């Protein structure tokens, strides 16, 4: 019936996921093959307009063209390591007030423990911006960004844009997109989010999870099935099926937020009475409407998940897609740990990285457990963890377990109903609403420590270790239930399904007064005369020149890993404190992956072009043009940009004179957009064998017409004593606005 593939999560024996790599139609909650749907009179062209995704996108599209979308969002959100740059850039473009609700949360540099006053200076700036321009300011420790947006801003049929890659509220009927800061700048300057109409993937859920299986287990199984082959890359996931009704809202939210790790563009779910009740409980009953695909809705491909077959999962270092069942790891721990050690040696150069020393009598012991943030710190997850630990303890050894409720209302409810007391009595450490463990700014494990976390990512050094100081640690992702089960056994890896647990989820009461008393809400009430308050670390962007017709690039970094993450391009953790200072932050670019990059990039900027290079260039473009060459640096990476939406992964290169990236492909749409918005050429070179190497100079010619007309770019590799070697690059699809930005040199220039 289908051209499909049964997915076994690594070495597991249970059929969990089926991928259908062809078009399907939706009818009566089931999926029909394209052939069968056409035989029943359905049309793919009409069916595409019957999806939930299409209806929401169309309602927000200002272009009048179903294929070329220009989206205006209903609301936006940023946290304290992105909003300063966004507002500064918008000010340069003429910002007078926020034209849509804009929420500024302070959940990343919340501890104010690095750099003296600089983190709190950013927070003071954020409050002054909310006052001046009319926004919402959520102070530190009140809520992580996505918890607040779910609780206070989501609504059926709405669209929200966030400067964080995990901006996902699909389970609440809201299409949400995580992008780099410049895309938010465009909205603040009353421009649009321009994309080609995305393809849509039906994710059909059936069955019901077994006790002990949580949202992270479902999410990791999905990520493990679709990430490596790009099955859903840059597509919208539309969750349908009768299995949805068997999932509480917070369970759905927990799956939904992790869809970012599949490399999809956005997500949306069918809504029901549980959605209605959640929105009503949070003071927005009018935000509910029933969302479901119409009969005959057409999807470009599909994924089917049997929830009853999903097992307790673990994603091994160093990516969420390295998903195994915990049962597999328990059975084959030595082999699986050695695979992780091999990956560390090959990809990180970490020859001394060891996990097999965590084995005791054939059983795996971990050093730390964390349940935190938008994925882990939900009310239901922490109640489930308390159920597992009730009457037990985490032990008096090296193992520790910390929990981070995602918001103060959640924290308050857990305290009122005794759940937090149960956790504390078991030896659990209570933290605040803080994203630190997700990006390396909180609960950093010991050197060579192995931490299990219900958070969003386990990329290299994402837990906060500093390889440059000889440190290394690692994280495996798990669900809160199995983390609690492991804690109950004092660090011995344990699936929650191995234990007999009576799960109790007390009724949740949301107290919105917590926010009303502490959060500033200035939506629609800008105070134009109010002054912005700047700390000494908050600086303007440097001047960036417009693109010229000829460009001499020097290759200053060459990375051949299968995927390069944004964490490798610009580290998170302590480094994030400097994101309000472009020049200072740029000093950390590629510091963990290629420590020599910054010095090489600076040398390109500061040193004159050698006469021999000018002579070689003159042979191609003429002597006059060669005497006035624009110059800059370029990096090569096979597939850069997986992970965070942080614009600094691109802007830091730009500050150091970066003018382009060369790649076989770009891991995410958002990273490519960040390059474009900072005026950098997103060059494509698909060949495995490279005609250029580290230190080579590449002359690009005829750039202005190539960008304007979308044609191939002609380049020449210039080496002393050798004839210029011709090489061709592609740019890929560019919107008219993106072309304008690249030609102007960056988004700010194009807005002036």
Regions found by a protein language model. Name each.
Residues 2-752:
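Fe-S-dependent hydro-lyases/dehydratases of central metabolism
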């Amino acid at each position: 019936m289908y051209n499909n593939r049964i997915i076994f999560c690594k070495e597991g024996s249970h059929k969990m996921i089926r991928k259908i790599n062809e078009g399907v139609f939706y009818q009566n909650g089931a999926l029909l093959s394209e052939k069968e749907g056409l035989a029943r009179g359905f049309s793919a062209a009409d069916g595409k307009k019957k999806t939930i995704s299409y209806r929401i996108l169309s309602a927000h599209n200002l272009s009048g063209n179903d294929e070329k979308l220009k989206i205006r969002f209903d609301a936006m959100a940023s946290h304290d390591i992105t909003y300063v740059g966004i507002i500064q850039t918008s000010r340069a473009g003429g910002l007078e007030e926020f034209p849509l609700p804009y929420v500024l949360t302070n959940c990343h540099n919340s501890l104010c423990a690095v750099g003296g006053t600089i983190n709190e200076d950013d927070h003071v700036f954020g409050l002054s911006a909310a006052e001046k321009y009319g926004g919402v300011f959520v102070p530190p420790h009140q809520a992580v960004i996505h918890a607040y947006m779910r609780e206070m801003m989501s609504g059926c049929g709405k669209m929200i844009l966030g400067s964080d890659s995990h901006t996902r509220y699909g389970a609440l009927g809201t299409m949400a997109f995580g992008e780099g800061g410049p895309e938010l700048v465009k909205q603040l300057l009353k421009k649009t989010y321009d994309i080609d109409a995305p393809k849509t993937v039906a994710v059909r859920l059936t069955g019901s999870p077994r006790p002990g299986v949580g949202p992270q287990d479902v999410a990791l199984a999905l990520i493990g099935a679709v990430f490596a082959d790009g099955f859903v890359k840059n597509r919208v996931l539309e969750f349908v099926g009768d299995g949805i009704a068997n999932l509480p809202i917070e369970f759905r939210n927990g799956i939904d937020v992790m869809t970012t790790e599949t490399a999809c563009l956005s997500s949306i779910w069918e809504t029901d009475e549980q959605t209605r009740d959640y929105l009503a409980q949070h003071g927005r009953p009018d935000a509910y409407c029933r969302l479901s695909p119409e009969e005959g809705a057409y999807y470009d491909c599909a994924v089917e998940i049997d929830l009853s077959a999903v097992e307790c999962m673990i994603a091994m270092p160093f990516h969420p897609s390295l998903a195994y069942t915990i049962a597999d790891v328990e059975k084959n721990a030595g082999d699986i740990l050695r695979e992780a050690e091999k990956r560390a040696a090959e990809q990180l150069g970490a020859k001394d990285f060891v996990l097999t020393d965590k084995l005791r009598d054939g059983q795996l012991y971990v050093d730390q457990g964390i349940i935190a943030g938008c994925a882990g710190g939900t009310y239901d997850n922490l109640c489930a963890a308390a159920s597992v630990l009730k009457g037990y303890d985490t032990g008096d050894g090296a193992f520790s377990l910390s929990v981070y409720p995602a918001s103060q209302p959640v924290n308050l409810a857990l305290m009122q109903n005794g759940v937090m007391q149960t956790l504390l009595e078991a030896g659990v450490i209570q933290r605040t609403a803080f994203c630190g463990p997700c990006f390396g700014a909180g609960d950093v494990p010991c050197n060579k420590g192995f931490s299990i976390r219900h958070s969003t990512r386990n990329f290299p050094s994402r837990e906060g270790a500093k390889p440059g100081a000889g440190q290394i640690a690692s994280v495996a992702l798990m669900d809160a239930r199995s983390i609690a089960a492991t804690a109950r056994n004092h660090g011995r890896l344990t699936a929650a399904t191995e234990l007999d647990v009576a799960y109790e989820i007390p009724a949740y009461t949301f107290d919105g007064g917590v926010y009303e008393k502490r959060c500033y809400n200035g939506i629609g009430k800008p105070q134009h005369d109010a002054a912005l308050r700047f700390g000494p670390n908050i600086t303007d962007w440097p001047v960036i020149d417009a693109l010229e017709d000829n460009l001499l690039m020097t290759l200053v970094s060459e990375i051949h890993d299968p995927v390069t993450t944004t964490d490798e391009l610009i580290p998170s953790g302590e480094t994030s404190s400097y994101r309000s200072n472009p020049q200072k932050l740029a000093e950390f670019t590629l510091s963990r992956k290629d420590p020599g990059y910054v010095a090489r990039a600076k040398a390109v900027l500061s040193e004159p072009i050698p006469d021999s290079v000018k002579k070689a260039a003159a042979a191609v473009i003429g002597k006059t043009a060669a005497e006035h060459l624009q110059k800059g640096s370029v990096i090569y990476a096979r597939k850069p940009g997986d992970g965070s939406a942080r614009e600094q992964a691109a802007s830091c290169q730009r500050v150091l004179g970066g003018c382009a990236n060369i790649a076989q492909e770009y891991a995410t749409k958002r990273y490519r957009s960040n390059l474009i918005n900072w005026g950098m050429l997103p060059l494509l070179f698909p060949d495995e064998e490279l005609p250029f190497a580290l230190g080579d100079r590449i002359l690009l010619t005829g750039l202005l017409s190539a960008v304007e007309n979308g044609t191939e770019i002609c380049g020449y590799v210039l080496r002393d004593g050798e004839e210029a070697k011709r090489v061709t690059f592609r740019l890929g699809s560019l919107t008219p606005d993106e072309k304008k930005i690249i030609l102007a040199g960056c988004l700010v220039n194009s807005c002036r």
